[in-house]
Amino acid sequence: MDSQPRLLLVHGSVVNAELTWNAQQPLAERFEIVAPNRRGFPPGPDVERVDFEDEAAWLEQFLEPGTHLVGHSYGGVISLLAAARRPELLRSLTVIEPPAFGVARGVPAADEFIARIEEHWTSGTRDPAEFLRGFLALVGSTTPTGNFTPELLQGARTLMVERSPAEAVIPFDELASAPLPKLVVSGGHSAAFDAVCDVLEERLGAERAVLPGAGHSVQRLGEPFNELVTSFVECAETS
């Protein structure tokens, strides 16, 4: 029996792999799913600093020949960097609203968003719960009602020590020349995220998809997202 295509799912900020990719469980019927928890997220301990470059190096341990890499949000930035480091190990690359806002500087919506995020980090509250509420409102994610769980509060503390993804230098030349299909997905809710995704589409020669209805966390749509990824990965397998 042939082995199943291998999907490596890289989560973003605030919540771990299990919560980020819960709606992708049905994909396990078609694919081998690898979804590691990044450092600083439950059930692991807190960390003092999160840096996307260091995370890209850490992610390499999970790359194997033929991997289909899928990254959401901060995990999308990590995935872009990891793909440029080891393109020979990848069969395809999918990123979902990576906050690499530096690539869209000069676009008013992106510039305004960068300013608001930087203000939140430098001048905002240091209370993890309130910091998280403000962050979720900024990026277009649903804010849970009531008190935050200990797991979410840990995610908030990790969020507070993240290096700004707007500082990421995306290696466009390496990625564009890599002979693998690329897909950029957005949720159609934010002009700032759309600006980033539009630049990535153009500079990487990527396919582009917009799936509205779940804000920043497009994968939480479940079936529509899963069908998109399934079609893209199966096409990549035969290309």
Residue ranges and their predicted role:
Residues 82-122:
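Flexible "cap/lid" loop of the alpha/beta hydrolase fold
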Residues 211-226:
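Catalytic histidine-centered segment of alpha/beta-hydrolase-like enzymes
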Residues 32-68:
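Active-site loop/oxyanion-hole signature of alpha/beta-hydrolase fold enzymes
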Residues 1-45:
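Conserved HGGG/HGGXW glycine-rich cap/lid loop of the alpha/beta-hydrolase fold
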Residues 71-75, 79:
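Gly/Ala-rich beta-loop-alpha elbow adjacent to hydrolase catalytic centers
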Residues 125-160:
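Conserved alpha/beta-hydrolase catalytic His-Asp/Glu region
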Residues 147-213:
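Conserved serine/cysteine hydrolase catalytic core
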Residues 69-71, 96:
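Short beta-strand immediately N-terminal to the catalytic nucleophile in serine-hydrolase-like folds
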